[in-house]
UniProtKB/Swiss-Prot annotation:
Acidic residues bias: start-end ranges: 668-679
Protein name, entry field: Zygotic DNA replication licensing factor mcm6-B
Zinc finger (C4-type): 159-186
Motif (Arginine finger): 529-532
């Protein structure tokens, strides 16, 4: 088929002699031969079916593998790579001819070619002028997307003087009119009108990409470059995506510089020379002016694909991913390793040590962050309400307790993570900003940290230092996982399906064990309820721990590689994470009942004043338990949430809900309203450490002898011992209440004291110790009655205010257990 370029016929009619590009025409012929002759591994013509697809109205781009091209003709591949921008129109003509041979293609339809699988990838920093015009592959993170516009690629103009049509005037990234009317009699050079019906337009979109943190040299500012997408490539990436762009680097006039406010963007008047030489010099900029001759580099992309889709690109959260599709993406050796990991009995611990090999201790935090990476299962109700599956974690702790290290580790490991500091971030920087485009002067949305971390993790350090108005901005993102913007005429709801890992310092710099969690952190109740897990790190002076940490740090400084003890490599963990995340575990009936039972326990404990939680228990904590259980099931590659998964989820949740550190109990506070409220921090866990700075030995409960000299020291009991005595008394009173004899169902205070002293008589060695023990148990019962309201004194006779009131205040009242009190395990 004899193809004649329409622009050539137009130029011939205008009497202009065009020089033939023989190299490009030869490339066109060879490329068409490649399309018609290249066969795949199955022996079929590889690109024939793709060409037949181009008949569909929405398709106009043929995707070609560069590896196939190199295999077919190395010289052709090299020429295309080096002279891509020059030969690109000719390659498109070859595609058009190839498509016409294999289908009924409309005459005026434009076709394009796109290349994939380019062998080398360049950084944005490496885009310099020597690379202009060659075929490149660059990678970066999309930070801003513009709306899709129609772009004029080939214009048909009407001469306003003689009504002649000038067809196929090629547009070079700016509005270009014909240089002269093609009618030999007419000398019109300026008065033309565009005929939009006969001109050709193509979809056009501009995006801005930026260097990723991993590619950035230390201390450098991230470079960014504008990318132009056309035809099928438009809308193929969203803000926050990490993508590879294949295309060429080109130079375009910088319109924003040329049309600076207050300066006319017209050709500046020149001092005329001899007649006929006034326009000599710069040509083709008539519409823009030559004031500054400002140009800029942009990247013209013909193909966009997610960076590393196997482990961490857009496919990480794809709904249609199955175990089979992931298995097909792995090599046999990789798949065997994933299978071996799934059979590991000690997988939970091994994954934690592999993820954070340089952080000593803090095992609970490691487990919580690991479950956050696996995540729960997102769901949608019948009404269309979305329930998030992502887990939010907050780490609160003293300075130098490795909070920021956890965040940095997650940022480096997670395929799509953004690290930001709370104090240096504004509401717009975290969510999304509306900015004015410098060229079109339209408002466009620029992605913030939460949008950039969509389908990933957003690490926010110094979370407590954020201004309140900035904290409020992420309320919606943390629960609904969307960001709503209504400003500058732009109304949009954007996705922010991200897990938030926050680190915060306590108020005053040190965690005060005598206060609840809420009093220790500068966070509002709505924000606190949106976190699934809270972890408290306290910098304790412990000789064993201090030695171990110092040893680990010195090892890291002296022998960096040898001291890192990993069971699995990071790549193996990433592969396993990707495989495990495609499981959608269902909750079994047994697990469902267990979850409900545990939630009831949390609510009842929160309701009773005795064991107040660190913050209010709401339905969000129930959802947190479900998400954590699903994360545990995913980690073990299970299709069903089992009670053991719920048990671990409840244990982690319990750790964060109840105050971890509890102060000593002051038994001498008689009718004083002290700030200290130990009942807020009661923890039934066996993990609670013995009280610190106490005057009572926490192991056997012996009281130290106190001097009678003023001022008299207050009698203090460590919290674990206080709790043990309290539980003993409650169990004894409940036992008496449950007896069905006709005896009394309550016990007098003196009888209870005698029973307790008899129980511990083996521990009492002297009369003095017996007196001390009796004093302690008397004070404990007084506190259980008047402060904790665990025990109730029964009034035998008369009502309050009657003549028998004095009898009610007897020294030896009957005691019963408060019916609302829940005895913890």
């Amino acid at each position: 088929m004899d193809l004649v370029d329409p622009s050539q016929s137009a130029a011939a009619a205008a009497g202009t002699q065009l020089v033939k590009d023989e190299v490009a025409e030869k490339c066109q012929k060879l490329f068409q031969d490649f399309l018609e002759e290249f066969r795949g591994s199955d022996g079929e013509l590889k690109y024939q079916s793709d060409a037949e697809e181009l008949i569909r109205p929405e398709r106009n781009t043929l995707l070609v593998s560069f590896v196939d091209l190199e295999q077919f003709n190395q010289q052709l591949a090299t020429t295309i790579q080096e002279e891509f921008y020059r030969v690109y129109p000719y390659l498109c003509r070859a595609v058009k001819a190839f498509a016409r041979d294999h289908g009924n293609i409309p005459q005026n339809k434009e076709f394009y070619v796109a290349f994939q699988e380019l062998p080398t990838r360049h950084k944005i920093r490496e885009l310099t002028t020597p690379r202009i015009g060659s075929l490149l592959r660059i990678s970066g993170q999309v930070v801003r997307t513009h709306p899709v516009h129609p772009e004029l690629v080939s214009g048909t103009f009407l001469c306003l003087d003689c009504q002649t049509l000038v067809r196929d005037v090629e547009q070079q990234f700016k509005y270009t009119q014909p240089s002269i009317c093609r009618n030999p009699v007419c000398a019109n050079r300026k008065r033309f009108m565009l005929d939009t019906n006969k001109s050709r337009f193509v979809d056009f979109q501009k995006v801005r990409i930026q260097e990723t943190q991993a590619e950035l040299p230390r201390g450098s500012i991230p470079r960014s470059v504008e990318v132009i997408l056309r035809a099928e490539a438009v809308e193929s990436c969203q803000a926050g995506d990490r993508c590879d762009f294949t295309g060429s680097l080109i130079v375009v006039p910088d319109i924003s510089q040329l049309s600076t406010p207050g300066v006319r963007a017209e050709t500046s008047s020149r001092v005329g020379g001899r007649e006929g030489y006034e326009a000599e010099g710069v040509q083709g900029l008539r519409a823009l002016g030559v004031r500054d001759l400002s140009y800029k580099l942009v990247f013209l992309a013909c193909y966009v694909c997610p960076t590393n889709p196997r482990f961490g690109g857009k496919d990480l959260h794809e709904e249609d991913m199955t175990a089979e599709s992931i298995k097909n993406q792995m090599s046999v050796k990789e798949w065997e390793k994933v299978f071996e990991m799934s059979q590991d009995k000690n997988l939970y611990h091994n994954l934690c040590t592999s993820l954070f090999p340089t952080v000593h201790g803090n095992d609970e935090v490691k487990r919580g962050i690991l479950l956050m990476l696996f995540g729960g299962v997102p769901k949608s109700t019948m009404e269309g309400t979305s329930l998030r599956g992502d887990i939010n974690v907050c780490v609160v702790g003293d300075p130098s307790t490795a909070k920021s290290q956890f965040l940095k580790h997650v940022e480096e490991f997670s395929p799509r993570a953004v690290y930001t500091s709370g104090k240096a971030s504004t509401a717009a920087g975290l969510t999304a900003a509306v900015v004015r485009d410098e060229e079109s002067h339209e408002f466009v949305i620029e992605a913030g940290a939460l949008m950039l971390a969509d389908n990933g993790v957003c690490c926010i350090d110094e979370f407590d230092k954020m201004d309140t108005k900035d904290q409020v901005a992420i309320h919606e993102a943390m629960e609904q996982q969307t960001i709503s913007i209504t400003k500058a005429g732009v109304k949009a709801t954007l996705n922010a399906r991200t897990s938030i890992l926050a680190a915060a310092n306590p108020v005053g710099g040190r965690y005060d064990r005598a206060k609840s969690l809420k009093q220790n952190v500068n966070l509002s109740a709505p924000i606190m309820s949106r976190f699934d897990l809270f972890f408290i790190l306290v910098d304790e002076c412990n000789e064993v721990t201090d030695y171990a940490i110092a040893r680990r740090i010195v090892d890291l400084h002296s022998r960096i590689e040898e001291s890192i003890d990993r069971v699995y490599t990071l790549d193996e963990v990433r592969r396993y994470l990707l495989f495990a995340r495609q499981f959608k575990p269902k909750i079994s009936k047994e697990s469902e009942d267990f979850i409900v039972e545990q939630y009831k326990r949390l609510r009842q404990r929160d309701g009773s004043g005795v064991t107040k939680s660190a913050w209010r228990i709401t339905v969000r904590q129930l959802e947190s338990m479900i998400r954590l259980s699903e994360g545990m099931a995913r980690m073990h590659c299970s299709d069903e949430v089992q009670p053991k998964h719920v048990k671990e989820a409840f244990r982690l949740l319990n750790k964060s809900i109840i105050r971890v550190e509890t102060p000593d109990v002051n038994l001498d506070q008689e009718d004083e309203h002290e700030v200290e409220e130990p009942q807020e921090g009661i923890n039934g866990d066996a993990d609670v450490p013995n009280g610190v700075n106490g005057h009572i030995n926490g192991i056997n409960g012996h009281a130290e002898e106190t001097n009678a000299a003023p001022p008299k020291p207050s009698l203090r009991l460590n919290f674990a011992e206080y709790k043990r005595i309290s539980n003993l008394l409650v169990l004894q009173l409940r036992k008496i209440e449950d007896e069905d004899d006709e005896n009394e169902t309550s016990q007098r205070k003196s009888e209870l004291i005698n029973w307790y002293l008899k129980e511990i008589e083996s521990e009492i060695d002297s009369e003095e110790e017996l007196v001390n023990r009796k004093q302690i148990i008397d004070k404990v019962i007084h506190r259980l009655v008047h402060y904790d309201q665990i025990l109730i004194e029964l009034i035998q006779t008369g009502l309050k205010g009657t003549e028998d009131e004095n009898v009610a205040k007897e020294e030896d009242p009957y005691l019963v257990v408060n019916p609302n009190y829940i005895l913890e395990d």
